[in-house]
Amino acid sequence: MDETLAEFFRRTILKIPMTEMMTILKTWNFMSENQLQTVNFRQRKESIVQDLVLLCEENHASLNDAAHLDIIYTQFHRHQKIWDVFQMSKAPGDDIDLFDMEQFKSSFKKILQRALKNVTVSFRDAEENSVWIRIAWGTQYKKPNQYKPAYVVYYSQTPYAFTSSSRLKSNLPLLGQALTVASKHHQIVKMDLRSRYLDSLKAIVFKQYNQSFETHNCTTSLQEGSLGLDINMDSRIIHENKVEKERVQRVTQEIFGDYPQPRLEFAQYKLETKFKSDLNGGILAEREEPLRCLVKFSSPHLLEALKSLAPAGIADAPLSPLLTCIPNKGKNYFKIRDK
Protein backbone atom coordinates (compact mmCIF):
# COMPACT_ATOMS: atom_id res chain seq x y z
CA MET A 1 0.00 0.00 0.00
CA ASP A 2 1.60 3.28 -1.07
CA GLU A 3 1.89 6.37 1.12
CA THR A 4 -0.93 8.23 -0.63
CA LEU A 5 -3.43 5.44 0.03
CA ALA A 6 -2.19 4.96 3.60
CA GLU A 7 -2.68 8.69 4.25
CA PHE A 8 -6.20 8.52 2.79
CA PHE A 9 -7.03 5.66 5.18
CA ARG A 10 -5.45 7.52 8.10
CA ARG A 11 -7.44 10.71 7.49
CA THR A 12 -10.69 8.82 6.87
CA ILE A 13 -10.39 6.80 10.09
CA LEU A 14 -9.23 9.84 12.06
CA LYS A 15 -12.48 11.74 11.39
CA ILE A 16 -14.64 8.90 12.76
CA PRO A 17 -15.79 9.73 16.34
CA MET A 18 -14.60 7.18 18.90
CA THR A 19 -18.21 6.54 19.96
CA GLU A 20 -18.95 5.30 16.42
CA MET A 21 -15.62 3.67 15.60
CA MET A 22 -16.56 0.03 16.23
CA THR A 23 -20.01 0.41 14.65
CA ILE A 24 -18.58 1.88 11.44
CA LEU A 25 -15.71 -0.62 11.25
CA LYS A 26 -18.10 -3.54 11.67
CA THR A 27 -20.44 -2.08 9.05
CA TRP A 28 -17.44 -1.78 6.72
CA ASN A 29 -16.76 -5.48 7.35
CA PHE A 30 -13.22 -5.28 5.96
CA MET A 31 -11.45 -6.47 9.10
CA SER A 32 -12.21 -9.71 10.91
CA GLU A 33 -13.47 -9.81 14.48
CA ASN A 34 -10.14 -11.34 15.55
CA GLN A 35 -8.20 -8.50 13.91
CA LEU A 36 -10.32 -5.85 15.63
CA GLN A 37 -9.73 -7.55 18.99
CA THR A 38 -5.98 -7.02 18.56
CA VAL A 39 -6.49 -3.25 18.60
CA ASN A 40 -6.41 -1.46 21.95
CA PHE A 41 -9.25 1.06 21.62
CA ARG A 42 -8.37 2.65 24.98
CA GLN A 43 -5.13 4.19 23.76
CA ARG A 44 -4.74 7.60 22.11
CA LYS A 45 -6.72 7.98 18.92
CA GLU A 46 -3.60 8.57 16.82
CA SER A 47 -2.24 5.21 17.98
CA ILE A 48 -5.56 3.48 17.26
CA VAL A 49 -5.60 4.94 13.76
CA GLN A 50 -2.04 3.78 13.15
CA ASP A 51 -2.91 0.23 14.23
CA LEU A 52 -5.96 0.20 11.96
CA VAL A 53 -3.95 1.48 8.99
CA LEU A 54 -1.47 -1.37 9.55
CA LEU A 55 -4.38 -3.84 9.48
CA CYS A 56 -5.56 -2.27 6.21
CA GLU A 57 -2.09 -2.82 4.78
CA GLU A 58 -2.05 -6.39 6.10
CA ASN A 59 -5.36 -7.05 4.29
CA HIS A 60 -4.03 -5.51 1.05
CA ALA A 61 -6.63 -2.75 1.09
CA SER A 62 -7.36 -0.92 -2.15
CA LEU A 63 -8.56 2.57 -3.00
CA ASN A 64 -12.06 1.15 -3.48
CA ASP A 65 -11.96 -0.25 0.09
CA ALA A 66 -11.05 3.20 1.40
CA ALA A 67 -13.85 4.75 -0.66
CA HIS A 68 -16.36 2.28 0.84
CA LEU A 69 -15.25 3.28 4.35
CA ASP A 70 -15.71 6.94 3.44
CA ILE A 71 -19.20 6.22 2.06
CA ILE A 72 -20.18 4.50 5.32
CA TYR A 73 -18.88 7.43 7.36
CA THR A 74 -20.89 9.81 5.15
CA GLN A 75 -24.02 7.68 5.56
CA PHE A 76 -23.68 8.04 9.33
CA HIS A 77 -23.08 11.80 8.98
CA ARG A 78 -25.25 12.65 5.98
CA HIS A 79 -26.60 15.75 7.75
CA GLN A 80 -23.16 17.36 7.49
CA LYS A 81 -23.74 17.88 3.78
CA ILE A 82 -26.28 19.96 1.89
CA TRP A 83 -28.31 17.86 -0.53
CA ASP A 84 -29.89 18.91 -3.82
CA VAL A 85 -32.66 17.00 -5.58
CA PHE A 86 -32.70 16.15 -9.28
CA GLN A 87 -35.78 14.91 -11.11
CA MET A 88 -35.58 12.88 -14.31
CA SER A 89 -38.26 12.17 -16.88
CA LYS A 90 -38.77 9.86 -19.83
CA ALA A 91 -39.58 10.94 -23.36
CA PRO A 92 -43.26 10.76 -24.38
CA GLY A 93 -44.13 7.24 -25.44
CA ASP A 94 -41.07 5.63 -23.82
CA ASP A 95 -41.72 2.19 -22.43
CA ILE A 96 -40.92 1.31 -18.83
CA ASP A 97 -37.70 -0.73 -18.92
CA LEU A 98 -36.73 -3.44 -16.50
CA PHE A 99 -34.14 -2.00 -14.13
CA ASP A 100 -30.89 -3.79 -13.38
CA MET A 101 -28.75 -2.20 -10.65
CA GLU A 102 -25.49 -3.75 -11.86
CA GLN A 103 -26.15 -2.49 -15.37
CA PHE A 104 -26.89 0.97 -13.95
CA LYS A 105 -23.56 1.02 -12.07
CA SER A 106 -21.58 -0.15 -15.08
CA SER A 107 -23.20 2.37 -17.43
CA PHE A 108 -22.84 5.26 -14.96
CA LYS A 109 -19.14 4.56 -14.39
CA LYS A 110 -18.33 4.13 -18.10
CA ILE A 111 -19.96 7.44 -19.02
CA LEU A 112 -17.89 9.36 -16.47
CA GLN A 113 -14.63 7.58 -17.27
CA ARG A 114 -15.02 8.04 -21.03
CA ALA A 115 -15.58 11.77 -20.60
CA LEU A 116 -12.99 12.35 -17.91
CA LYS A 117 -9.65 10.59 -17.66
CA ASN A 118 -9.13 11.12 -13.94
CA VAL A 119 -12.23 10.19 -11.96
CA THR A 120 -12.86 7.58 -9.26
CA VAL A 121 -16.35 6.10 -8.91
CA SER A 122 -17.40 3.81 -6.05
CA PHE A 123 -20.80 2.33 -5.16
CA ARG A 124 -22.44 0.98 -2.03
CA ASP A 125 -25.89 -0.60 -2.01
CA ALA A 126 -28.22 0.68 0.69
CA GLU A 127 -31.78 0.31 1.95
CA GLU A 128 -34.93 0.62 -0.16
CA ASN A 129 -33.19 -0.42 -3.40
CA SER A 130 -30.96 2.62 -3.30
CA VAL A 131 -27.30 3.00 -4.15
CA TRP A 132 -24.80 5.50 -2.77
CA ILE A 133 -22.30 6.72 -5.34
CA ARG A 134 -19.02 8.39 -4.38
CA ILE A 135 -17.28 10.40 -7.10
CA ALA A 136 -13.78 11.81 -6.66
CA TRP A 137 -13.31 14.31 -9.48
CA GLY A 138 -10.03 15.03 -11.19
CA THR A 139 -9.19 16.81 -14.43
CA GLN A 140 -7.44 15.77 -17.61
CA TYR A 141 -4.17 16.71 -15.90
CA LYS A 142 -4.80 16.16 -12.18
CA LYS A 143 -5.58 12.99 -10.27
CA PRO A 144 -8.93 12.70 -8.46
CA ASN A 145 -9.16 14.62 -5.20
CA GLN A 146 -10.20 11.92 -2.72
CA TYR A 147 -10.75 14.47 0.04
CA LYS A 148 -13.50 16.45 -1.73
CA PRO A 149 -15.77 13.82 -3.28
CA ALA A 150 -19.32 14.31 -4.50
CA TYR A 151 -22.07 11.94 -3.39
CA VAL A 152 -25.15 10.78 -5.24
CA VAL A 153 -27.99 8.73 -3.75
CA TYR A 154 -30.20 7.11 -6.37
CA TYR A 155 -33.35 5.09 -5.70
CA SER A 156 -33.83 2.49 -8.41
CA GLN A 157 -36.87 2.73 -10.66
CA THR A 158 -37.62 6.27 -9.50
CA PRO A 159 -36.98 9.57 -11.30
CA TYR A 160 -35.16 11.10 -8.31
CA ALA A 161 -31.50 11.43 -7.39
CA PHE A 162 -30.03 13.30 -4.42
CA THR A 163 -26.59 14.87 -4.73
CA SER A 164 -24.33 16.54 -2.22
CA SER A 165 -23.61 20.12 -3.22
CA SER A 166 -20.27 20.37 -5.00
CA ARG A 167 -18.01 23.31 -5.70
CA LEU A 168 -17.17 21.80 -9.08
CA LYS A 169 -20.27 23.12 -10.87
CA SER A 170 -18.61 22.42 -14.22
CA ASN A 171 -19.06 18.68 -13.64
CA LEU A 172 -22.83 18.88 -13.06
CA PRO A 173 -23.79 18.46 -16.75
CA LEU A 174 -21.64 15.32 -16.99
CA LEU A 175 -23.11 13.96 -13.76
CA GLY A 176 -26.63 14.65 -15.04
CA GLN A 177 -25.86 12.91 -18.31
CA ALA A 178 -24.51 9.83 -16.50
CA LEU A 179 -27.58 9.62 -14.27
CA THR A 180 -30.03 10.11 -17.13
CA VAL A 181 -28.48 7.54 -19.47
CA ALA A 182 -27.71 4.93 -16.80
CA SER A 183 -31.25 5.08 -15.36
CA LYS A 184 -32.78 5.08 -18.88
CA HIS A 185 -34.42 8.48 -18.65
CA HIS A 186 -34.61 11.24 -21.25
CA GLN A 187 -33.82 14.44 -19.37
CA ILE A 188 -32.96 15.74 -15.90
CA VAL A 189 -33.71 18.99 -14.04
CA LYS A 190 -32.59 20.33 -10.69
CA MET A 191 -35.51 20.89 -8.33
CA ASP A 192 -35.86 24.01 -6.18
CA LEU A 193 -35.44 21.88 -3.08
CA ARG A 194 -32.45 21.63 -0.77
CA SER A 195 -31.73 20.54 2.81
CA ARG A 196 -29.19 18.87 5.08
CA TYR A 197 -31.77 16.23 5.94
CA LEU A 198 -31.69 13.63 3.19
CA ASP A 199 -34.49 11.51 4.69
CA SER A 200 -36.81 14.53 4.76
CA LEU A 201 -36.07 15.36 1.12
CA LYS A 202 -36.84 11.76 0.23
CA ALA A 203 -40.09 11.90 2.22
CA ILE A 204 -41.14 15.08 0.39
CA VAL A 205 -40.48 13.94 -3.19
CA PHE A 206 -41.90 10.45 -2.57
CA LYS A 207 -44.91 11.91 -0.69
CA GLN A 208 -44.09 9.79 2.36
CA TYR A 209 -44.14 12.46 5.05
CA ASN A 210 -47.65 11.47 6.22
CA GLN A 211 -46.65 7.79 6.43
CA SER A 212 -42.97 7.40 7.22
CA PHE A 213 -42.99 9.68 10.25
CA GLU A 214 -44.60 8.68 13.52
CA THR A 215 -48.17 9.96 13.73
CA HIS A 216 -49.73 11.61 16.73
CA ASN A 217 -53.37 11.57 17.77
CA CYS A 218 -54.60 15.14 17.88
CA THR A 219 -58.32 14.35 17.97
CA THR A 220 -58.71 14.95 21.70
CA SER A 221 -61.09 17.85 22.29
CA LEU A 222 -59.58 20.98 23.74
CA GLN A 223 -60.25 21.59 27.40
CA GLU A 224 -60.39 25.02 28.97
CA GLY A 225 -57.39 24.24 31.12
CA SER A 226 -55.29 23.29 28.10
CA LEU A 227 -56.19 26.59 26.46
CA GLY A 228 -54.68 28.55 29.31
CA LEU A 229 -57.97 30.30 30.13
CA ASP A 230 -58.63 32.10 33.40
CA ILE A 231 -61.55 30.44 35.20
CA ASN A 232 -62.57 33.84 36.59
CA MET A 233 -62.94 35.29 33.08
CA ASP A 234 -66.36 36.15 31.67
CA SER A 235 -67.96 32.95 30.32
CA ARG A 236 -68.74 34.58 26.95
CA ILE A 237 -65.07 35.51 26.49
CA ILE A 238 -64.05 31.99 27.51
CA HIS A 239 -66.41 30.54 24.92
CA GLU A 240 -65.18 32.95 22.22
CA ASN A 241 -61.53 32.15 22.96
CA LYS A 242 -62.23 28.44 23.01
CA VAL A 243 -64.04 28.52 19.67
CA GLU A 244 -61.23 30.54 18.07
CA LYS A 245 -58.49 28.29 19.42
CA GLU A 246 -60.36 25.21 18.23
CA ARG A 247 -60.71 26.82 14.80
CA VAL A 248 -56.98 27.60 14.66
CA GLN A 249 -56.09 24.05 15.66
CA ARG A 250 -58.53 22.58 13.14
CA VAL A 251 -57.22 24.74 10.29
CA THR A 252 -53.61 23.99 11.24
CA GLN A 253 -54.35 20.27 11.35
CA GLU A 254 -56.07 20.39 7.95
CA ILE A 255 -53.04 22.09 6.40
CA PHE A 256 -50.14 20.32 8.13
CA GLY A 257 -51.77 17.05 9.23
CA ASP A 258 -51.29 15.19 12.51
CA TYR A 259 -47.81 13.96 11.70
CA PRO A 260 -44.37 15.52 12.29
CA GLN A 261 -43.17 17.56 9.35
CA PRO A 262 -40.18 16.79 7.11
CA ARG A 263 -37.12 18.66 8.32
CA LEU A 264 -36.00 21.67 6.28
CA GLU A 265 -33.86 24.53 7.56
CA PHE A 266 -34.98 27.35 5.29
CA ALA A 267 -37.30 28.62 2.58
CA GLN A 268 -36.27 31.37 0.20
CA TYR A 269 -38.52 33.71 -1.80
CA LYS A 270 -37.29 35.97 -4.59
CA LEU A 271 -39.75 38.70 -5.52
CA GLU A 272 -39.49 40.47 -8.87
CA THR A 273 -42.14 43.06 -9.69
CA LYS A 274 -42.63 46.16 -11.82
CA PHE A 275 -43.24 49.41 -9.95
CA LYS A 276 -46.84 50.54 -10.28
CA SER A 277 -48.16 53.94 -9.24
CA ASP A 278 -51.20 56.11 -9.99
CA LEU A 279 -49.05 59.18 -9.43
CA ASN A 280 -47.48 60.69 -12.56
CA GLY A 281 -43.84 61.57 -12.34
CA GLY A 282 -43.03 59.42 -9.33
CA ILE A 283 -39.41 58.68 -8.56
CA LEU A 284 -39.69 55.12 -9.88
CA ALA A 285 -42.29 55.75 -12.58
CA GLU A 286 -39.76 55.57 -15.43
CA ARG A 287 -37.82 52.66 -14.00
CA GLU A 288 -37.47 49.84 -16.53
CA GLU A 289 -35.76 47.36 -14.22
CA PRO A 290 -38.11 45.44 -11.90
CA LEU A 291 -37.84 45.80 -8.17
CA ARG A 292 -36.22 42.78 -6.58
CA CYS A 293 -36.20 41.58 -3.04
CA LEU A 294 -35.17 38.39 -1.25
CA VAL A 295 -36.92 36.99 1.83
CA LYS A 296 -35.51 33.99 3.64
CA PHE A 297 -37.13 32.11 6.52
CA SER A 298 -34.78 29.92 8.53
CA SER A 299 -35.15 27.65 11.53
CA PRO A 300 -33.59 24.39 12.75
CA HIS A 301 -36.96 22.82 11.84
CA LEU A 302 -38.78 25.30 9.60
CA LEU A 303 -42.00 23.38 8.84
CA GLU A 304 -42.63 22.54 12.51
CA ALA A 305 -41.96 26.21 13.35
CA LEU A 306 -44.49 27.33 10.72
CA LYS A 307 -46.98 24.76 12.01
CA SER A 308 -46.76 26.25 15.51
CA LEU A 309 -47.15 29.93 14.52
CA ALA A 310 -50.96 30.15 14.50
CA PRO A 311 -51.57 27.98 17.62
CA ALA A 312 -49.04 30.16 19.45
CA GLY A 313 -50.92 33.32 18.45
CA ILE A 314 -47.97 34.69 16.44
CA ALA A 315 -49.77 34.54 13.08
CA ASP A 316 -53.33 34.31 11.80
CA ALA A 317 -54.72 31.01 10.55
CA PRO A 318 -54.51 29.91 7.84
CA LEU A 319 -50.96 30.87 6.94
CA SER A 320 -50.14 32.07 3.44
CA PRO A 321 -50.13 29.26 0.85
CA LEU A 322 -46.59 30.36 -0.05
CA LEU A 323 -45.52 29.04 3.35
CA THR A 324 -47.75 25.98 3.61
CA CYS A 325 -47.23 24.62 0.08
CA ILE A 326 -43.57 23.68 0.57
CA PRO A 327 -44.02 19.89 1.04
CA ASN A 328 -46.73 19.53 -1.61
CA LYS A 329 -44.85 21.53 -4.23
CA GLY A 330 -41.57 19.86 -3.30
CA LYS A 331 -39.59 23.10 -3.24
CA ASN A 332 -38.16 25.58 -0.77
CA TYR A 333 -36.84 28.06 -3.35
CA PHE A 334 -39.53 30.28 -4.87
CA LYS A 335 -39.46 32.97 -7.56
CA ILE A 336 -42.45 35.30 -7.51
CA ARG A 337 -43.02 37.44 -10.60
CA ASP A 338 -45.82 39.59 -11.98
CA LYS A 339 -48.39 37.69 -14.01
From Swiss-Prot:
Q: Which UniProt keywords apply?
A: Centromere, Chromosome, Kinetochore, Nucleus, Phosphoprotein
Q: Name one Pfam family in it.
A: CENP-N
- Which residues in this protein are found as Phosphoserine? S226, S235
Q: Where in the cell is it found?
A: Nucleus; Chromosome, Centromere; Chromosome, Centromere, Kinetochore
Subcellular location, principal: nucleus
Q: Which InterPro entries match?
A: CENP-NAC/CAD_complex, Chl4/mis15/CENP-N
Q: Which GO terms describe its cellular component?
A: kinetochore; nucleoplasm
BP GO terms, sorted: CENP-A containing chromatin assembly; chromosome segregation
Give the top-rank taxon of the lineage listed in the UniProt record for this protein: Eukaryota
Q: What does this protein do?
A: Component of the CENPA-NAC (nucleosome-associated) complex, a complex that plays a central role in assembly of kinetochore proteins, mitotic progression and chromosome segregation. The CENPA-NAC complex recruits the CENPA-CAD (nucleosome distal) complex and may be involved in incorporation of newly synthesized CENPA into centromeres. CENPN is the first protein to bind specifically to CENPA nucleosomes and the direct binding of CENPA nucleosomes by CENPN is required for centromere assembly. Required for chromosome congression and efficiently align the chromosomes on a metaphase plate.
Q: Which family does it belong to?
A: Belongs to the CENP-N/CHL4 family.
Assembly and partners? Answer: Component of the CENPA-NAC complex, at least composed of CENPA, CENPC, CENPH, CENPM, CENPN, CENPT and CENPU. The CENPA-NAC complex interacts with the CENPA-CAD complex, composed of CENPI, CENPK, CENPL, CENPO, CENPP, CENPQ, CENPR and CENPS. Interacts directly with CENPA. Identified in a centromere complex containing histones H2A, H2B and H4, and at least CENPA, CENPB, CENPC, CENPT, CENPN, HJURP, SUPT16H, SSRP1 and RSF1.
Q: What is this protein called?
A: Centromere protein N
Annotated organism of origin: Bos taurus
